[in-house]
Regions:
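Single conserved hydrophobic/aromatic residue that forms the stacking wall/gate
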Residues: 1-11
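Charged, cofactor-coupling segments
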Residues: 9-10, 14-132
């Protein structure tokens, strides 16, 4: 059953990493344009020990017009808190802490209206600002 379900689900739904764009060694070049999605998957893996990765699906959206044309940016589609327990703030720049806190603020502002009081309080705690 598990094998059938997995295969059926794979064939029924869009594949998260389908092209035409790909970030890999052997690929066909394709432009990134608004409306496409990519995944942002930073992580670290210690051989034989452990690993951790966060993953967000990002939407490509227009950012600004310049004399060189339109610039794009990535906007997160998946809004999940990032666990602060494993973060060593002394290894982060001020800019990285600002990004992290702005991301968590967005997570809270987008998700909290859909939650009950208990869930909202939990989300408020886990998305509270990261401090040094």
């Amino acid at each position: 059953y598990t094998q059938w379900y997995t295969l059926s689900l794979h064939d029924a739904l869009p594949i998260l990493h389908e092209g035409p764009h790909q970030f890999r060694m052997n690929h066909m070049p394709a432009l990134l344009v608004p409306g496409m999605t990519v995944t942002n998957e930073p992580g670290i893996y210690k051989a034989g020990r452990h690993g951790v990765r966060t993953e967000n699906t990002m939407l490509i959206v227009p950012s600004q017009e310049t004399e060189f044309g339109t610039y794009y940016k990535f906007e997160p589609l998946t809004l999940c808190p990032i666990d602060k327990e494993a973060i060593l703030t002394d290894m982060l720049s001020d800019e990285e802490i600002t990004w992290f806190n702005q991301y968590h603020e967005k997570v809270y502002n987008c998700l909290s209206p859909e939650l009950n009081n208990e869930e909202r309080e939990w989300l408020k705690e886990v998305t509270s600002p990261l401090k040094r």
